[in-house]
Amino acid sequence: MSARISKQLRLSVPPCLANRTTASNSSSCVTEVEPLLQSFSSTLVLIVLATVIFCLVVLSLSTFHMHKSKMKKRKIEKAQEEYERDHCSPKAERGHLHGMGRGGTHGSPTSPTIQRKEHIRLDLGASVNEEPQLEASGLDRATEHLQQSVVLS
């Protein structure tokens, strides 16, 4: 009996609803595009998701590369400052000690003093020897050599 009822219901239902289509005003059945949109939207979602993941990977790699180059520059600057501090300041102090050994006063050294960032301060009242200038030019060459070796490595 249930088979008869289901057959009667099927016959009473218009063919548009049985085929999952809708009837328009002209009573013709129009196919629905919903299954196509569902498959297209899921494909679109997968493409968007893959694009987002790819963009995140590219962004993280570029950020890492920029940070790495920034840290490398900082490391080079720090090494240069450390080199200047370690190699220029002791020479300046040695210049003071040499000046005192030659009979100079504690307040005014007799040789040029090399300060940080390679500025040379001369005492106008004292005589200037050639040796301190040679030491300063040697420091300039040593600093250039260090900068070249740091840049190359």
UniProtKB/Swiss-Prot annotation:
Biased composition (Basic and acidic residues): 77-96
GO CC entries: membrane
Sugar attachment sites: N19, N25
Signal peptide region: 1-18
Keyword Ion transport: no
Sequence intervals crossing the membrane: 44-64
Cytoplasmic side of membrane: 65-153
Residues in the Extracellular compartment per record: 19-43
Mode of membrane association: Single-pass type I membrane protein
Transmembrane in keyword set: yes
Main location: membrane
Coiled-coil segments: none
Localization in the cell: Membrane
Region (Disordered): 75-115
PANTHER family: CHROMOSOME 11 OPEN READING FRAME 87 (PTHR31870:SF2), SI:DKEY-183I3.9-RELATED (PTHR31870)
Name of the protein described by the UniProt record: Uncharacterized protein C11orf87 homolog
